[in-house]
């Protein structure tokens, strides 16, 4: 491989794999690895057991591998195995390894043949292995067998995709030679996720089970059905061999003998078999790790940056420091106070861009919700006139009055002012609710100290409740002050002299019409909900609201006006959301029981959020469109019953004139009261509740916490937080160490280019059968070459393969005694398994004694 650093690459990734698997970050990091993919009977498990030289994988009928097995092979002087979930325990008996795999599988999936994507990490140390990391995945199947779930095919496919879709995962596609290779499940999956073939390595098993007269020579030479990284053939133990306890050492010797003696494969013998496959995978994985090092390093750096800020507070953590808890308590209280102030004042460093929070929500209560609640409690026009007429008549008593009595004005105003108490109390309740939510939000940073968080929330919430009572008393006092004295000398009050004059002016204005430019109150998108039902769905229009009318256009350019609706006699009502609707709806209707728009009694308008609805309602209030009150229908029926009174009132011109005068006076005075209440309510709540709570947190919260009792109990750390801190610190140090190692290796290695692309269109056509010799015209960029061929297109430097003796004239090259005798596959020239031998086709079949040795 060129240097020692490259040899350390696979152990490095193994260490990363263990470290990040332990803290649940493996999927995010996407470490380089080899995923073994194939059908249920393709021979995947046998290939892995041949690598290790031991029987250690579960066997049986149906689906046996039900969880991914991350198999980490480490070259060492002693032979043993370790599981990540059994840290510190060494397994020297590989039968125990098999039982532990089965037990660990059942612990997660149960015993009902279910599957799980949670991997089992197994590390095998042995002098007979090369450094390698593979992931054994469940075999693909089409039909459920026994008690397998009906959708087992899709479950397994989903699990495979979780691994093979990662760019850093090499795919070991295992296919049996005795079935149609063009229909191989493994190659189909590989083609789907790796269309360029840059990550796929082909393995052909069961070469000894092919029909007589057939072979896979052209496939192994990468002429038929070529892959970019080529194919390697292996011969595994048969079921009879397994039942007969034939050991893997003998099986490897038999495999070697098979390739040396078979006339179709003997010229490829040095590039076939399990030992050679292991070497190639070691080289391919090493090269792949080196190629992915820059991307891996970038990911590690980004993860390190993302946790560095959080780890900063843990770095200097000293659990045995006696002053630690006191310092932490002071810091937590100070942080809580600062967060609360920032959330209320709106200068927080973490600004929510999705919804209103903290002070912004309280601001909306003050300036949208509270005015809306005030107007909801305002008088109904017809009802008010009827009350005024009764008040005037009752004040005059038996006499017929000549003048408009001011007592009627005072009685009516007091009744209207009294109604302001309910929305004022509701405003306080809404602010208390928002303050409590803000306290909970601010205390989220205290989750590492659950007792402290609980106690702090309790103390502050109790204080808010105390201030709530005081604030409500003050609010009631404000309303009572308004009731105590009617200031008819107020500069904004029109007075008796101007009341009639104003009434006349209003009548003239209505008669002449407003010719001046009308002030626009609001513009925005609204969906007309009910009209679109008959026309294929609701539609969105651009609405423009003024004091006189409501218009809507096709778009916000306001060129194509769809309709204009007068706001006179309009009212608002809420509409319940539909079963499948996510929009919030309100409706406009006419108080005189007329159609609002064409044949529709009401116009339903929809918004995306409740905040938008509230904002539109507040805008309609400014235009004089008030919400419907609960008792409107009953009052309407009462008005109909008392219709004779109304007619009688209207028949008396003097009474009608007096009612109009009082009506104008009440309207003028209530406007003053409303303005005063709307101005003083936020100020009262701010002073008595919000600012007071802020001062309490800054000055008294710490003293209250100290008086609660034992500070050690208060500052007990949650088990989850302690575990999280340990995990974050472990991850932080693992990331730093990994970056250090990667940095050293990346600067001392030489890049090896990828094998050239091949014609893999056969994976899409899937019409060529395997198992038969292909004609020499099979689509491939490679052909058999003479003994000393010139450099071919696509070659890169000296060709790998057998020793130079293979180029001797006339005779066949001597077959190396074992795969290890071939040139070092980790040398500078790339080892491309798909390249055929340069030896002449005719190879004598005399036995070679040196081919009997077994790789150690």
Swiss-Prot record:
UniProt keyword Cell membrane present: yes
Modified residues (3'-nitrotyrosine): 125
Keyword Repeat: no
Catalytic activities: GTP + H2O = GDP + phosphate + H(+)
Biased composition (Polar residues): 763-781
Domain (PH): residue spans on this chain: 519-625
Modified sites of kind Omega-N-methylarginine: 796
Residues reported in the UniProt entry to bind GDP: 41, 43-46, 59-60, 206, 208, 211, 236-237, 239
Positions of region (Disordered): 750-856
Region of interest (G1 motif), ranges: 38-45
InterPro entries in alphabetical order: Dynamin, Dynamin_GTPase, Dynamin_GTPase_CS, Dynamin_N, Dynamin_stalk, G_DYNAMIN_dom, GED, GED_dom
Record-level Gene Ontology MF annotations: GTP binding; GTPase activity; microtubule binding
Ranges of biased composition (kind: Pro residues): 825-844
Annotated spans, G5 motif: 235-238
Region named G4 motif: 205-208
UniProt-recorded name of the protein: Dynamin-1
Naturally occurring in which organism (per UniProt): Bos taurus (Bovine)
Lineage: Eukaryota, Metazoa, Chordata, Craniata, Vertebrata
């Amino acid at each position: 491989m060129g240097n020692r650093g490259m040899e350390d690459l696979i152990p490095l990734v193994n260490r990363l794999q263990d470290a990040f698997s332990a803290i649940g970050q493996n999927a995010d990091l996407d470490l380089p690895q080899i995923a073994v993919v194939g059908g249920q009977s393709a021979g995947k498990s046998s290939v892995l057991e041949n690598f290790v030289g031991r029987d250690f994988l579960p066997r049986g009928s149906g689906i046996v591998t039900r969880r991914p097995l991350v198999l980490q092979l480490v070259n060492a002087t002693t032979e043993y195995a370790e599981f990540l979930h059994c840290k510190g325990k060494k397994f020297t008996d590989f039968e125990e390894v098999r039982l532990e795999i089965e037990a660990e599988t059942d612990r997660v999936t149960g015993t009902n043949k279910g599957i799980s994507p949670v991997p089992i990490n197994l590390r095998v140390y042995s002098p007979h292995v090369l450094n390698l990391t593979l992931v054994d995945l469940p075999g693909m199947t089409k039909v459920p067998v026994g008690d397998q779930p009906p959708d087992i095919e899709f479950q397994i496919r989903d699990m495979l995709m979780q691994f093979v879709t990662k760019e850093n995962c090499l795919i070991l596609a295992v296919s049996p030679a005795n079935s149609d290779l063009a229909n191989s499940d493994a190659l189909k999956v590989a083609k789907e996720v790796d269309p360029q073939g840059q990550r796929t390595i082909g393995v052909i098993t069961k070469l000894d089970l092919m029909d007589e007269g057939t072979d896979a020579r052209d496939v192994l030479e990468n002429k038929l059905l070529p892959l970019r990284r080529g194919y390697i053939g292996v011969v595994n133990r048969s079921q009879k061999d397994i039942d007969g306890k034939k050991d893997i050492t003998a099986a490897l010797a038999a495999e070697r003998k098979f390739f040396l003696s078979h006339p179709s494969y003997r010229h490829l013998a040095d590039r076939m078999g399990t030992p050679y496959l292991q070497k190639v995978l070691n080289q391919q994985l090493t090269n792949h790790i080196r190629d992915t090092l820059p991307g891996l390093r970038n990911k590690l750096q980004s993860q390190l940056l993302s946790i560095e800020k959080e780890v900063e507070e843990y770095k200097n953590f000293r659990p045995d420091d006696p002053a630690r808890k006191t310092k932490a308590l002071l810091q937590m209280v100070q942080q809580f106070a600062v967060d609360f102030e920032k959330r209320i004042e709106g200068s927080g460093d973490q600004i929510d861009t999705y919804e209103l929070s903290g002070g912004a929500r309280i601001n909306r209560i003050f300036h949208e919700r509270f005015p809306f609640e005030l107007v909801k409690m305002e008088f109904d026009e017809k009802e008010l006139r009827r009350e005024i007429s009764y008040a005037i008549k009752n004040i005059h008593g038996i006499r017929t009055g000549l003048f408009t009595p001011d007592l009627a004005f005072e009685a009516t105003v007091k009744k209207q002012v009294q109604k302001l108490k309910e929305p004022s109390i509701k405003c306080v309740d809404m602010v208390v609710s928002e303050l409590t939510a803000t306290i909970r939000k601010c205390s989220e940073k205290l989750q590492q100290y659950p007792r402290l968080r609980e106690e702090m929330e309790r103390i502050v919430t109790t204080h808010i409740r105390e201030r709530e009572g005081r604030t409500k008393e003050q609010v009631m006092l404000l309303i009572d002050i308004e009731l105590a004295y009617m200031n008819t000398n107020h500069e904004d009050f029109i007075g008796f002299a101007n009341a009639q004059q104003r009434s006349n002016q209003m009548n003239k204005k209505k008669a002449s019409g407003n010719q001046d430019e009308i002030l626009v109150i609001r513009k925005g998108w609204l969906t007309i909900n009910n009209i679109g039902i008959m026309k294929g769905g609701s539609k969105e229009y651009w609405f423009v609201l003024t004091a006189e009318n409501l218009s809507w256009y096709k778009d916000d350019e306001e060129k194509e006006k769809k309709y204009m609706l007068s706001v006179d006699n309009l009212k608002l009502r809420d509409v319940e959301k539909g079963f499948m609707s996510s929009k919030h709806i309100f409706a406009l209707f006419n108080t005189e029981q007329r159609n609002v728009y064409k044949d529709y009694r009401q116009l339903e308008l929809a918004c995306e959020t409740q905040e938008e609805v509230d904002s539109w309602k507040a805008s309609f209030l400014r235009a004089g469109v008030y919400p419907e009150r609960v008792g409107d229908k009953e009052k309407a029926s009462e008005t109909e019953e008392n219709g004779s009174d109304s007619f009688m009132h209207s028949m008396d011109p003097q009474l009608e004139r007096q009612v109009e005068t009082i009506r104008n006076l009440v309207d003028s005075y209530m406007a003053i009261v409303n303005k005063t209440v709307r101005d003083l309510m936020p100020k009262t709540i701010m002073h008595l509740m919000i600012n007071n709570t802020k001062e309490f947190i800054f000055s008294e919260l710490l003293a209250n916490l100290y008086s609660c009792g034992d500070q050690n109990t208060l500052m007990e750390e949650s088990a989850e937080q302690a575990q999280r801190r340990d995990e974050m610190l472990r991850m932080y140090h693992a990331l730093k160490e990994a970056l250090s190692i990667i940095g050293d290796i990346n600067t001392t290695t030489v890049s090896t280019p990828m094998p050239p692309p091949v014609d893999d269109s056969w994976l899409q056509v899937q019409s060529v059968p395997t198992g038969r010799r292909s004609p020499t015209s099979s689509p491939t960029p490679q052909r058999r070459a003479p003994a000393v061929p010139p450099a071919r297109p696509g070659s890169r430097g000296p060709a790998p393969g057998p020793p130079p003796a293979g180029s001797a004239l006339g005779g066949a090259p001597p077959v190396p005694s074992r795969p290890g005798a071939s040139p070092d596959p980790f040398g500078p020239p790339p080892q491309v398994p798909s390249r055929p031998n340069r030896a002449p086709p005719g190879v004598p079949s005399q036995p070679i004694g040196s081919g009997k040795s077994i790789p150690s």
